[in-house]
């Protein structure tokens, strides 16, 4: 094998093995705005009910208490790349639903010209042998314009998380949202089947 073939093979190997999550600065998502919770006084940041209501809930409802359905984190950044790492509570499997629906996360970007949220990407969880307490990592997007934009990460539907870290370029700004969107205009309660929440 001549030297050029060897260099080409090494170059291809290095390209394939390069870590797409390298060089990020991660910050705890609780530093930013957590939205879509009915109460702020929950025992953990990504659960939906205060502990005081748990005694009156059936066991099946207590299981759902740990699911982060509907909860999202709002932030603004000028990073050219955005990633996330999160720690799943249960990491279980359902035969009838894709893992993205059970324990994936979704990144949205606010198109300020149109005043609409646009889907950017979804974290497709790795099985990790279905061990509870597994850590998931995702590079959502890269090659952004480097301007400040508003973002939102929706948390898993049928699982919960212990913690979430937002990853940005090491020199990028990562701040609380600058725009109130969605706006707080009172509370809405919707009662229905699992179809209501996207199941």
Write out the residue ranges for each language-model feature.
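Bacterial Sec-dependent N-terminal signal peptides
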Residues: 1-20
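N-terminal secretory targeting modules
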Residues: 15-187
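Catalytic nucleophile-elbow at a beta strand-turn-alpha helix junction centered on a G-D-S/GDSL motif
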Residues: 185-199
């Amino acid at each position: 094998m001549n030297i050029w073939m060897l260099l080409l093979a090494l170059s291809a190997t290095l390209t394939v093995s390069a870590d797409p999550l390298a060089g990020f600065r991660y910050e705890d998502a609780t530093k930013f705005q957590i939205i879509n919770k009915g109460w702020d006084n929950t025992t953990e940041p990504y659960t939906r009910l205060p502990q005081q209501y748990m005694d009156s809930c059936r066991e099946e409802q207590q299981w759902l208490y740990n699911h982060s359905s509907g909860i999202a984190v709002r932030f603004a950044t000028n990073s050219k790349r955005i990633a996330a790492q999160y720690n799943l509570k249960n990491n279980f499997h359902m035969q009838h639903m894709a893992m993205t629906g059970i324990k994936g996360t979704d990144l949205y970007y606010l198109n300020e010209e149109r005043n609409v949220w646009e889907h950017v990407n979804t974290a497709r969880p790795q099985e990790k042998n279905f061990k509870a307490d597994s850590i998931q990592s995702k590079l959502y997007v890269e090659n952004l314009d480097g301007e400040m934009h508003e973002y939102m990460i929706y948390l898993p539907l049928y699982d919960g998380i212990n913690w979430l870290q937002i990853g940005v370029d090491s020199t990028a700004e990562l701040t609380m949202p600058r725009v109130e969107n969605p706006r707080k205009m009172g509370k809405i309660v919707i009662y229905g089947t699992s179809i209501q929440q996207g199941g």
